[in-house]
Amino acid sequence: FFFFKAHKARVGARTSFLTEMERGSRDHHRDHRDHREHRETREPPTLAFHMKSWKTINKSLKAFAKLLKENATVTFTPQPSIIIQSAKNHLVQKLTIQAECLFLSDTDRFLTKTINNHIPLFESFMNIISNPEVTKMYIQHDSDLYTRVLVTASDTCTQASVPCVHGQEVVRDTGRSPLRIDLDHSTVSDVLKWLSPVTKTKRSGKSDALMAHIIVQVNPPTIKFVTEMNELEFSNSNKVIFYDVKNMRFNLSAKNLQQALSMCAVIKTSCSLRTVAAKDCKLILTSKSTLLTVEAFLTQEQLKEESRFERMGKQDDGKGDRSHKNEDGSALASKQEMQYEITNYMVPAKNGTAGSSLFNEKEDSESDDSMHFDYSSNPNPKRQRCVV
């Protein structure tokens, strides 16, 4: 009797244990299913602007929209940041919108994505973020093949799925430089005014590639901007500060130098002039504010014939560092500078006019004049020396 009673108790305990296991397994599968359904229904990771911060940089973004047109791409990163990059021959321009201006809902699931600046319906991404009528804008990552852009403006709410661009390189500064010179905003404006008549001459067809040359000398620390028309010289002062100096010369397109300085002048802070030893980048101009960072990477142009700058450079070599002549003189002129290749993903406008846009806001001017600083003084003096 006692044997059968004990056996019955053991069977009951085993049955109870199996029931608990089955119940636990069912609960686990149910929880897993609920988690999967929640994951499938929750919102994709979303990048958005802090609208209060965005309003403070809206005018700057409007100016950048005019300067960043050629071969422009937009990269969204999980830092978060938005990088707008534009490329032309011997010049790469880069605008970074910092994390202080952005909000990201899920940093773990948001992957770096790159799209073309041209967006159907909106005309361009820069047009969206520089339009004062925008009240909300979201960038959502729910596919590796495209990026979803949602825009709200007054009584309009629109979204577009933009194909991603793969294999696109973001130009980055190595941070190591044998040269660093800081120019304050007023000095940058002075150089732009000085360059203005030189770049305007190009429209008359007198020259295919008008050059601007930069000469840096160690003793005493000076930086010269030289063209065929005249030259501008700055020495060490509270407006031009020499941190690291090396005898160097740069042969640049005057138009490229003007556009790079114009980018730096927009945010009205000091401009840092640096260089790197890599073949594909010789000169870097950088300006930073709390919310924006501007970088311009310029590579040297090849000189077709000996210019006044080259003749003057030969005279300066007797006073300066002769080893630098072998480094940056004829050796560079005989080599083809490597170039950052950023493919043109821009969609050409029909009949030479801008395509239709959701906002369709008429710009003040679409000509190059809208990017130039006014220049009214007489450039007759062949040499100008600026010392503060």
Swiss-Prot record:
Q: Which InterPro entries match?
A: DNA_clamp_sf, Herpes_PAP
Tell me the GO molecular function terms: DNA binding; DNA polymerase processivity factor activity
Q: Which UniProt keywords apply?
A: DNA replication, DNA-binding, Phosphoprotein
* Compositionally biased tracts (Basic and acidic residues): 306-328
Identify the stretch annotated as signal peptide in this record.
none
- What is the superkingdom listed in this entry's lineage? Viruses
Presence of keyword Iron: no
Q: Between which residues do disulfide bridges form?
A: none
What Pfam families has UniProt attached to this entry? Herpes_PAP
- SUPFAM superfamilies, sorted: DNA clamp (SSF55979)
Where does the record place the region Disordered?
20-44, 306-388
A Gene Ontology biological process in which this protein takes part is: DNA replication
Ranges of compositional bias, category Basic residues: 26-36
The protein's job, in short, is: Accessory subunit of the DNA polymerase that acts to increase the processivity of polymerization.
Family label: Belongs to the herpesviridae polymerase accessory protein family.
Q: What protein does this entry describe? A: DNA polymerase processivity factor
